[in-house]
From Swiss-Prot:
Record-linked SMART domains: KRAB (SM00349), ZnF_C2H2 (SM00355)
Gene that produces this protein: ObI1
Lineage: Eukaryota, Metazoa, Chordata, Craniata, Vertebrata
Biological process (GO), any one: negative regulation of DNA-templated transcription
Pfam family, one: zf-C2H2
GO molecular function, one term: zinc ion binding
Known tissue expression: Expressed during osteogenic differentiation where levels increase from the first days of differentiation and remain high during the whole process. Highly expressed in lung.
Domain KRAB: 16-87
Name under which the protein is recorded: Zinc finger protein OBI1
Source domain of life: Eukaryota
Length: 680
């Protein structure tokens, strides 16, 4: 039974097909278009096709639309080679023009029943004025499912002989021995799938000498006369026996194409030739050595036959997880022929027809990333690669640390971890036994951080947990300053110090203090400054309970208790706890006094001395004691004064235990003990 969308009138008005609104470019014109013009062309063609589909005037998807949807250019290799070989003889017959009009209306045919009886063919003949011989030659029958399909065109070479230089050849029939199924399974791909709908679209495909595959064959009937051999699905014996090509173009043609020696099919690139090669040799590039599941990359006919034969896509037998790299194979409905898919979840026992549903359903069963595959039947790894999935099932850890028995899936992580433990204690990490999948730093566990600090400084024997911390620390000993300010050429050992320094040169300082209206370049600088107004001191020394507003001040203070003095003067050998103290001390050897008073031109070696001196000119006393309202020039004076109100005496003599409120008092007192020692 044939459904007519509308009766074709005998006047000029008729059904609109995609070819009526399509815009064609020659190969030379297409090369002159830029990327934007090609994108515009693609968008316009796709929009026209969608409009025709919505109106019901385009049942079969044109080859041009299939190429544009997949991101390919509308020009195949055949047309490009035709432009490159202008001397090749072209052939056309009067019957070709008549068949063009027949082909135009055949695109509107739609099959309703699974079989097409003779009366339906007669109706097609009467409706569309198509010759009965064309109808018989255009129908193919599937012996398994009794589906009938039309071919898009009748081979124009069947009845019209063409003399060639090698002699006269012609073909009178086109046998289609497809063994178990004779369904037309070729490009465009969406026509190759069975549908459970009542109305199944025809698969219009031209089966002439230029049979369409994923890549259009370079030998077309318009260019060469080709005798076509029988098409069988046994080893894909599709071939072109004789081709009449002028000898002067054979060398150029061989350079531009890659051909397969068994079936003489020609491909535009090496990748497609390799894929086709594996089809003949039976090789499968993507296979699991453990289970050897098949990853089939063959054409659509083989895919359909596998559905009849019950062949499953590549499966992992251990947990019934399927890895199908050909998405088109999943769309063949096995229930149409009474077959059943065996997509089974080993945990829940559910079965699925389509692999994506099966995989998404199994993911919730995964306990954790590193759990064994045998425990739950499905590895909770999102990696699609079969070898990576197999590595979970076999519990393969190719790289193992000999010192602590830690295992790594990736070889690149092992030397990083071994170098971290090379200079430190070889403690046993068998308690952890952590498996690292994707860790940027293997020395950092996902759980609590390890107690050891394997990176040690050779100068001061200080240890660090990360190598970057050690490198940053060593700059303090070497004096290296790789970060330089482009404005004043001042160098810094840390990048954070450079960023903080660049605020001096910044024209805008967006962060302003609400108390004193002083502005800052960084938000962190404003936060530190605000603590001078609020008196907040969140950092407290655990030894003497002294608090500080900055963590750096606490770190410097703690060196008093530890006695650490890493900064040593090369001139006199004196050591200092702070680098700033060393710099100030070195100026006593050089005599440098860079800080000069603008009022009296007096110079000082320290900036604090200059600031203290400038208050004698201005009379400003910015620091006031909240207890007695006494003001001071410097904050240090205020701090020393506040000890009087607090009755605090933090400086204690180790000899006699006497305490003092100021360090200068303690220093003066210690001289008494030194004098007693010398006199004794």
């Amino acid at each position: 039974m044939v459904r007519r969308r509308q009766r074709l009138p005998e006047v000029d008005m008729g059904l609109v097909s995609f070819e009526d609104v399509a815009v064609d470019f020659t190969w030379q014109e297409w090369q002159e278009l830029d990327a934007a013009q090609r994108t515009l062309y693609r968008d316009v063609m796709l929009e026209n096709y969608r409009s025709l589909v919505w109106l019901g005037h385009c049942l079969a998807k044109p080859e041009l639309i299939s190429k544009l949807e997949e991101g390919f250019e509308p020009w195949g290799v055949a047309e490009a080679t035709e432009q490159c070989l202008p001397g090749v003889r072209k052939w056309s017959a009067p019957v070709e023009k008549g068949q063009q009009s027949q082909e135009k209306y055949l695109r509107q045919v739609k099959i309703i029943k699974k079989n097409t009886p003779d009366e339906d063919k007669v109706e097609v003949e009467n409706t569309y004025n198509v010759d009965s011989n064309c109808i018989s030659n255009m129908t193919l029958k599937n012996e398994v499912c009794s589906r009938v399909f039309f071919q898009e065109l009748v081979n124009p070479l069947l009845d019209v002989p063409l003399p060639t230089e090698a002699g006269e050849r012609q073909s009178t029939e086109v046998p289609h021995d497809l063994n178990r199924t004779q369904e037309v399974l070729s490009y465009p791909k969406h026509f190759t799938h069975h549908s459970k709908d009542q109305y199944s679209q025809c698969c219009f495909q031209y089966f002439g000498p230029d049979e369409a595959f994923h890549t259009k064959a370079i030998l077309t009937p318009e260019m060469f006369y080709v005798q076509e051999t029988s098409r069988t699905c046994n080893n894909y014996d599709k071939s072109f026996d004789e081709v009449t090509i002028p000898a002067q173009y054979m060398t150029q043609l061989r350079k531009q194409t890659l051909g397969w020696n068994i079936c003489h099919k020609i491909f535009p690139n090496k990748t497609e030739l390799s894929n086709h090669d594996a089809m003949h040799t039976g090789e499968n590039d993507d296979k699991c050595d453990y289970e050897k599941p098949i990853i089939n990359k063959s054409l659509y006919l083989t895919k359909h036959q596998e559905a009849h034969a019950g062949i499953e896509p590549q499966a992992h037998k251990e947990n019934i997880k399927f890895f199908c790299l050909d998405a088109e194979l999943q769309t063949v409905d096995p229930e149409l022929h009474g077959e059943k898919q065996v997509y089974e979840c080993k945990v829940s026992g559910k079965t699925f027809r389509h692999q994506p549903e099966h995989i998404s359903q199994q993911r919730p069963h995964a306990c954790e990333r590193a759990c064994q595959a045998k425990e739950h039947g499905e590895a909770g790894c999102d990696e699609p690669a079969l070898t990576q999935h197999q590595r979970l099932c076999t519990e393969e850890k190719a790289c193992e640390g000999k010192a602590c028995s830690k295992a790594f899936h990736h070889k690149s992580l092992l030397p990083q971890y071994q170098s971290a433990r090379a200079d430190e204690q070889q403690s046993d990490c068998k308690e952890l036994m952590k498996i690292y999948f994707y860790v940027s730093s293997p020395t950092q566990h996902h759980g609590p951080p390890p107690p050891e600090k394997p990176f040690r400084c050779n100068d001061c024997l200080k240890t660090f947990s990360h190598k970057s911390q050690l490198e940053r620390h060593q700059r303090m000993h070497t004096g290296e300053k790789p970060h330089e300010c482009k404005e004043c050429r001042k160098a810094f050992c840390h990048k954070s110090h450079l960023i903080r320094h660049q605020g001096i040169h910044a024209p805008e300082k967006p962060y302003e203090c609400n108390e004193c209206k002083k502005s800052f370049y960084l938000r962190s600088q404003l936060t530190l400054h605000e603590r001078t107004h609020t008196g907040e001191k969140p950092f407290e020394c655990k030894e003497c309970r002294k608090a500080f507003s900055r963590n750096s001040h606490l770190t410097q203070h703690q060196k008093i208790h530890t006695g650490e003095k890493p900064h040593k003067c090369k001139e006199c050998g004196n050591a200092f706890a702070r680098k700033s103290h060393l710099i100030q001390h070195q100026k006593t050897h050089t005599g440098e006094r860079p800080y000069e008073c603008k009022e009296c031109r007096k110079a000082f070696s320290r900036k604090s001395q200059l600031m203290q001196h400038e208050t004698t000119h201005t009379g400003e006393r910015a620091y006031e004691c909240k207890e007695c309202r006494k003001t001071f020039y410097l904050k240090a004076y205020l701090t020393r004064h506040q000890v009087i109100h607090q009755s605090e005496k933090p400086f204690e003599c180790k000899k006699c235990g006497k305490a003092f409120s100021r360090k200068s008092y303690l220093t003066r007192h210690q001289k008494i003990h030194k004098g007693q020692t010398l006199s004794g």
